[in-house]
Amino acid sequence: MARVKRAVNAHKKRRVVLERASGYRGQRSRLYRKAKEQLLHSFTYNFRDRKARKGDFRKLWIQRINAAVRAEGITYNRFIQGLHLAGIELDRRALAELAVSDPEAFKAIVEQAKAALPADVNAPKEA
């Protein structure tokens, strides 16, 4: 049986690892063993942060909606309650986009949500 020489495969494997680690600082971009270890950590961070990014965007959308509805004189949670009662099924991503790009349409949605809300139970009683 012929002898199998693995130098070509080994060099290719190392080259690929070092190419993927090219943006790292110091030894992590130049030494194979350090680069390989850093790549393993990077994959872990990447997996974790792909999940976290979804929550980050949701927080951003909520902040944008909250700022826009407070300008209309209503709080975020009352606005969401009003949307639910009015039967408007827009997600937070679409609402945030409307608040930024089309304030007039967003204002109309806020008015519909306000109209669907019951009377404020925490308002001071009129004498």
Swiss-Prot record:
GO terms for molecular function: rRNA binding; structural constituent of ribosome. InterPro entries: Ribosomal_bL20, RIBOSOMAL_L20_CS, Ribosomal_protein_bL20_C. SUPFAM superfamilies: Ribosomal protein L20. Keywords: Ribonucleoprotein, Ribosomal protein, RNA-binding, rRNA-binding. GO terms for cellular component: ribonucleoprotein complex; ribosome. Coiled coil: none annotated. GO terms for biological process: ribosomal large subunit assembly; translation. The keyword rRNA-binding applies. The keyword Nucleotide-binding does not apply. Binds directly to 23S ribosomal RNA and is necessary for the in vitro assembly process of the 50S ribosomal subunit. It is not involved in the protein synthesizing functions of that subunit. PANTHER family: 39S RIBOSOMAL PROTEIN L20 (PTHR10986). HAMAP family: Ribosomal_bL20 (MF_00382). NCBIfam families: rplT_bact. Belongs to the bacterial ribosomal protein bL20 family. This is Large ribosomal subunit protein bL20. It comes from Bifidobacterium adolescentis (strain ATCC 15703 / DSM 20083 / NCTC 11814 / E194a). The lineage of its organism: Bacteria, Bacillati, Actinomycetota, Actinomycetes, Bifidobacteriales.
